[in-house]
Amino acid sequence: MNQPSVIKLRELLDLLPHRYPFLLVDKVLSYDIEARSITAQKNVTINEPFFMGHFPNAPIMPGVLILEALAQAAGVLIGLVLENDRNKRIALFLGIQKAKFRQAVRPGDVLTLQADFSLISSKGGKAWAQARVDSQLVTEAELSFALVDKESI
């Protein structure tokens, strides 16, 4: 069932190990644990540190960071699924398949991050993820994750 509540920044910090300047999810718009699906948001501002060098006169969000934002959104859902185990285990980004970059992301854009898992197990997971700006598909990829004990890293 689709959860009605939005997950805002303070709660995200309990679900993800990332912090500024590498936290690339601003809030979760919706999630469905049973369907293994999540939709999150990243507000792309001119103040992002990466825009200083990518590119100063024509700022574009690096594609690898769009993929990272998608992975972080997926990581939030893994944290919600783990529930009682999330203090002991962590999802590590394992791989990217079938990545396509269709459109540039610029300051002022709002990225909508969608991840739908085909697999979540005790060892890891696999999700199809898409990023959109104004309903236009900008990036898509298959993401895979490994679940490991936090003490082992």
Curated annotation (Swiss-Prot):
It is found in: Cytoplasm. It catalyses: a (3R)-hydroxyacyl-[ACP] = a (2E)-enoyl-[ACP] + H2O. Signal peptide: none annotated. Its EC number is 4.2.1.59. GO terms for cellular component: cytoplasm; membrane. The keyword Cell cycle does not apply. It is an enzyme of class 4 (lyase). Its main location: cytoplasm. Keywords: Cytoplasm, Lipid A biosynthesis, Lipid biosynthesis, Lipid metabolism, Lyase. The active site is at residue 54. GO terms for molecular function: (3R)-hydroxyacyl-[acyl-carrier-protein] dehydratase activity. The keyword Translocase does not apply. GO terms for biological process: fatty acid biosynthetic process; lipid A biosynthetic process. Involved in unsaturated fatty acids biosynthesis. Catalyzes the dehydration of short chain beta-hydroxyacyl-ACPs and long chain saturated and unsaturated beta-hydroxyacyl-ACPs. Belongs to the thioester dehydratase family. FabZ subfamily. This is 3-hydroxyacyl-[acyl-carrier-protein] dehydratase FabZ. It comes from Chlamydia pneumoniae. The lineage of its organism: Bacteria, Pseudomonadati, Chlamydiota, Chlamydiia, Chlamydiales. The gene is fabZ.
